[in-house]
Regions:
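N-terminal secretory signal peptides that target proteins for export/translocation
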Residues: 1-2
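Bacterial N-terminal signal peptides
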Residues: 5-15
C-alpha cells in the first residue's frame, strides 16, 4: 500500500500537480465588457464594467492573476452593488458575497473561495474578495450576493 501511495505521489509531482490537461480544441468564451450595456452610477467613473445595478465588477480586474506560494492563481476582485451599505450597523449576518467557479476546458481541482470583505473609498462602498484557482485555463466565475448572481468567463494563461 505504501508503494502505491508513493507511485501516485510521484505521478502527481511529475505531471505538474495542479496543471491538469486542457482540451486543446476548446475556445474559451471569454466575457467582454462590450457584451453588457450596464452603466454604474457616475461616481464610479468610466468602465469597463460588467453586471447589473444590483451586482457588478470591473472587467480589467480579470486580467491580473498572480500565483501564490502554492501555485494557485489568485486575483483580487472588487464587486459593487447599489444596495451595499458598508457601515457596521448594516452589515448582514450572512456573507456579503460568495464566489463559485468551474473550469470549462478540462478537469481541475475546485476553486477555493476565501472570504469577502467590505471596503470603502469616500462615498463609494464596495466588496473585495479573493479566490484561488488551481490551474490556468478557461474559468466560469459566479458571484452571489443577496439573491443576485453575476457570472463571467476568464482565460488564465500561464
Amino acid at each position: 500500500m505504501l508503494t502505491l501511495r508513493l507511485i501516485v505521489a510521484a505521478v502527481f509531482l511529475i505531471s505538474g500537480g495542479n496543471q491538469l490537461k486542457a482540451d486543446d480544441s476548446f475556445t474559451c468564451p471569454v466575457t467582454k465588457a462590450s457584451e453588457q450595456t450596464f452603466v454604474p452610477p457616475a461616481l464610479w467613473g468610466a468602465g469597463p464594467w460588467y453586471g447589473t445595478e444590483k451586482l457588478w465588477t470591473r472587467v480589467e480586474m480579470w486580467e491580473h492573476w498572480r500565483k501564490d506560494e502554492l501555485g494557485y492563481y489568485v486575483p483580487k476582485l472588487a464587486w459593487f452593488s447599489s444596495t451595499f451599505d458598508w457601515t457596521p450597523e448594516h452589515w448582514p449576518k450572512e456573507r456579503l458575497l460568495t464566489i463559485t467557479g468551474r473550469r470549462l476546458d478540462g478537469p481541475s481541482k475546485p476553486l477555493i473561495f476565501e472570504t469577502a470583505n467590505n471596503a470603502y473609498m469616500p462615498g463609494r462602498p464596495f466588496i473585495t474578495a479573493s479566490v484561488h484557482l488551481p490551474t490556468a485555463g478557461c474559468w466560469e466565475i459566479t458571484g452571489h450576493s443577496k439573491g443576485e448572481t453575476l457570472t463571467f468567463v476568464v482565460e488564465i494563461v500561464p
